């Protein structure tokens, strides 16, 4: 039994994609006998941009855009070598950024 834990942080623009990826990671870790805490949804980061609609005049007419970045956090406790091998072989979608730390 190890005292270290694996912390996985997922980041994506599409919430459905990140939830599916988090579920795959949880199922894979539980299949190998590890204990998983999470996925914990972290606050969504919202970036807003104001862009002029007209190239010359009409400063009052603007387009408002936003980008939402969804975050999920998971801790894998009591992991084994089988768990790390299974997580390394896991194929996640291209729109999900995965950050893994061993603490």
Curated annotation (Swiss-Prot):
Keywords: Ribonucleoprotein, Ribosomal protein. Gene3D superfamilies: Ribosomal protein S10 domain (3.30.70.600). SUPFAM superfamilies: Ribosomal protein S10. PANTHER family: 30S RIBOSOMAL PROTEIN S10 FAMILY MEMBER (PTHR11700). Belongs to the universal ribosomal protein uS10 family. GO terms for molecular function: structural constituent of ribosome; tRNA binding. The lineage of its organism: Bacteria, Pseudomonadati, Pseudomonadota, Betaproteobacteria, Neisseriales. This is Small ribosomal subunit protein uS10. The gene is rpsJ. GO terms for biological process: translation. It comes from Neisseria gonorrhoeae. Pfam families: Ribosomal_S10. One of its GO terms (cellular component) is ribosome. It comes from the Bacteria. SMART domains: Ribosomal_S10. Involved in the binding of tRNA to the ribosomes. Part of the 30S ribosomal subunit.
């Amino acid at each position: 039994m190890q005292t270290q834990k694996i912390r996985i942080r997922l980041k994506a623009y599409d919430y459905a994609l990140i939830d599916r990826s988090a579920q795959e990671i949880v199922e894979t870790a539980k299949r190998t006998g590890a204990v998983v805490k999470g996925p914990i949804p972290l606050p969504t980061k919202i970036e807003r941009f104001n862009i002029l609609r007209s190239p010359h005049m009409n400063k009052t007419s603007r387009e408002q855009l936003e980008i939402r970045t969804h975050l999920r956090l998971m801790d894998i406790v009591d992991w084994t070598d089988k768990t790390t091998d299974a997580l390394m072989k896991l194929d996640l979608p291209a729109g999900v950024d995965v950050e893994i730390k061993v603490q």
